[in-house]
Every structure is written in C-alpha cells, then in structure tokens.
A protein has these predicted regions:
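Charged, low-complexity intrinsically disordered tails and linkers
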Residues: 1-39, 44
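A broadly conserved detector of short glycine/acidic/proline-rich loop/turn motifs that flank catalytic sites
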Residues: 31, 55, 89
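Intein-associated homing endonuclease modules of the LAGLIDADG/DOD-type, together
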Residues: 39, 58-60
Length: 100
C-alpha cells in the first residue's frame, strides 16, 4: 500500500482533514500548548504534530514509522483519527515532509 503523505501548516487544518478523509496521511503542525507536560511518563517537547488519517491507513503508516496502533487517538466528530507526535520525532517528520 502506497500512501500519499503531505505536510500542512497550523492554519491549514481544514485542508489537512479533507486530505486525510480522502485517504491521504496529513502531517499537521499543531500548537505547542503541551510543551513541558507529561503523558504516560513521557515529557512532551515542542514541536507538536498531528498525523491524521483514516484508521486503516493511519495504522499502516504508523507501522512503517515505528508507531503503535494503540497510540492512535480515536475518531470523534470526523471519520479520521490521529497520532500525537512531538519532540525530536516531530522535528524529523517536519524536516522530511515540510516543503520549506
């Protein structure tokens, strides 16, 4: 399975969700509100991203990139789910996928 992956800036959330609902994987730059907080014993550092997609596609992309399916945040008002990604791994994704 080849997945189309695209990076979206903060203000492009509508475009990111539409892209993900269409079957792509959207790497969306999120706000850094949680910088310094902890979750499950991990300290969250900026930058923060959401990796958004239809669950099946997101699981496939996650497996290719070392992310576990149980880390996926559930679908809520939309049909897409997402991973929360932060810190050095988020920096790697930005470096790889950001057009700038």
């Amino acid at each position: 399975m080849r997945l189309d992956v695209r990076y979206f800036e903060r203000r492009q959330i509508k475009e990111a969700i539409a892209f993900a609902e269409g079957g792509g994987i959207a790497i969306h730059r999120n706000f850094d509100h949680y910088h310094g907080s902890t979750i499950r014993g991990m300290r969250r550092e900026r930058p923060f991203l959401h990796v958004i997609g239809l669950r099946e596609n997101l699981e496939a992309w996650g497996r290719l990139h070392g992310l576990r399916p149980e880390w996926i945040q559930p679908e809520k008002r939309r049909k897409v789910a997402h991973y929360d990604v932060f810190g050095p791994y988020a920096e790697e994704l930005i470096a790889k996928w950001s057009p700038s």
